[in-house]
Amino acid sequence: MAKKILLVDDAAFMRKMLKDTLSKNGYTELYEAVDGADAVEKFDELKPDLVIMDITMPNMDGLEALKAIRGKDGSANVVMCSAMGQESMVMDAVRSGAKDFIVKPFKPDRVLKTVTTILGGA
């Protein structure tokens, strides 16, 4: 069965870049959310195998969404995306249960390595 991945970022171009990278490498069950609140709602609806989520977003940021998701499912696989210079936020995310973090702008092979490590192959 295909692995479901939820891509969460308020920037449409970042979601598209992630989607393109993953779809070119065999991941087909890709879903999108535009902010943390949308991510929590879609997590409940889709039960994805992995969530890749930005930290800085409107309405509900990635850290709040991470805590909400992990509160619902303690085994949820969540990877945070962050720009350079947000190291303290990244450490907060890891302490809150994030499996890994990817620095933006990301390199496609770094995204794939992280996804493959957590989920196995496509």
Over which residues does each language-model region extend?
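Receiver (REC) domain active-site loop signature in two-component systems and cognate sites
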Residues: 57
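Charged docking surfaces used in two-component/phosphorelay signaling
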Residues: 16-24, 91
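Short hydrophobic/Thr-rich beta-strand motif most characteristic of the beta2 strand and flanking loop
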Residues: 27-34, 42
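C-terminal output helix
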Residues: 88, 106-115
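Active-site beta3 strand of CheY-like receiver
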Residues: 46-52
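Acidic catalytic/metal-coordinating carboxylates
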Residues: 35-38, 61-64
